[in-house]
């Protein structure tokens, strides 16, 4: 969705970050990147929204990249371990591609017993963060997953060509790694 917005003559890119249950994700650092350099950034507010002011430089390509690296244990509990184990045993399969992403604690694009071990180490305090993954992953809301039972690889950034107009609807789904029951 694009459209002109009156923001003091500035061009802005804006969107929101929600969980797959439509809860807003606050405190996500959203960066505007050009040629591997951060041009500007902001943290999402309590409703999960962000607005980035874009430099008036025609022809530039920009990347919008969300990151949240804090509170790795938030929302992660033994209930998540039980849920992943039931999935692995075929007793209660995941019903969302985002649960697969959340369960992939070691970031190897599959869900296995190794992920259970990694999540258990986080719960027990052996880890303060996942060694091979970030505490939150973000998926472009408009990304069409070819196989919801194997959602990898997925678009975790949005790339745009600057056209001199404001763009809204640059939305992401936030996935808390380890939190398959979405309690964070």
What are these regions (language model features)?
Residues 2-184:
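Cellulosome-associated attachment modules in secreted, modular CAZymes
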